[in-house]
């Protein structure tokens, strides 16, 4: 809350993709509606769109920062929303993108998975969109193995998000145990990796589901794993 004092509400989830999935659902878009996003992205982003029975529409990126190219945004979009990604923590051109969404009356969703703490013209990334997804996965700025948050900046979306959020179950004991075991097992694996033992420890731990994977096989087939979405206490 101190990092984002302007936000209307913050909701915590078991993963960034859970936050994005529920945030998109709260927009209450008609089935099949299109959402604009850049093509260079993690598979979990278009999955969150598809899991809501919506359609991703991919756009090209700029070579210099791997972010969405605002100069090729469609002039007559049929889309209802746009997801802007701040790739590798480099802020996208929020001046052009925000103006575009306001002019075309599109919901603006920020993917802040890489960019917690970044700013664009002295304004924090995450404070531009109607909603913003943050990720606390094992490869993010703040890691809790799995975890995420949804910032709601549009006051009209607070109640829809809250209603959906309260209907979610908490993560199971077994899933939580997997995440708690991840740090000590990966620590042991790294210490013995040069002897090939660490690689075996990591492989067997994931194979036997003692620890979790960052991306699950079901997700690669655009299927929803049973433990997404979940809220945190």
Indicate where each model-derived feature is located:
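Structural signal for conserved beta-strand scaffold positions within catalytic alpha/beta enzyme cores
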Residues: 12, 58-60, 134-135
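Short loop-beta-helix segment that forms the pyridoxal 5′-phosphate
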Residues: 1-23, 37-39
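Short acidic capping loops at alpha-helix termini that bridge into adjacent secondary structure
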Residues: 8-9, 31-34, 159
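Short glycine-biased active-site loop of nucleotidyltransferases that positions the nucleotide triphosphate
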Residues: 123-126
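Residue-level preference for short coil/turn positions at secondary-structure junctions
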Residues: 6, 31, 77-78, 102, ...
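PLP-dependent aminotransferase-like
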Residues: 18, 25-119
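Active-site region of PLP-dependent enzymes
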Residues: 116-121, 131-146, 151-233
């Amino acid at each position: 809350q101190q990092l984002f004092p302007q936000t209307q509400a913050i909701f915590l989830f078991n993963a960034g993709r859970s936050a994005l999935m529920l945030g998109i659902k709260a927009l209450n878009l008609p089935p099949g509606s299109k959402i604009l996003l850049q093509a260079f992205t993690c598979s979990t982003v278009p999955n969150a769109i598809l899991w809501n029975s919506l359609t991703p529409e991919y756009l090209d990126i700029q070579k210099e920062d791997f972010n969405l190219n605002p100069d090729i945004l469609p002039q007559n979009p049929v889309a209802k929303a746009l997801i802007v990604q701040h790739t590798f923590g480099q802020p996208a051109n929020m001046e052009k993108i925000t103006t575009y969404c306001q002019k075309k009356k599109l919901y603006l969703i920020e993917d802040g998975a890489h960019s917690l703490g970044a700013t664009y013209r002295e304004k924090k990334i995450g404070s531009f969109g109607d909603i913003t997804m943050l990720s606390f996965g094992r490869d993010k700025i703040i890691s809790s193995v799995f975890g995420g948050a949804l910032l709601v900046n549009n006051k009209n979306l607070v109640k829809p998000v809250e209603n959906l959020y309260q209907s979610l179950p908490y993560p199971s004991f077994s899933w939580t145990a997997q995440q708690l075991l991840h740090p000590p097992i990966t620590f042991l694996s790294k210490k013995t990796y040069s002897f090939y033992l660490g690689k075996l420890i990591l492989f067997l731990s994931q194979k036997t589901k003692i620890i979790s994977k960052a991306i699950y096989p079901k997700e690669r087939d655009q299927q929803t794993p049973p433990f997404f979405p979940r809220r945190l206490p």
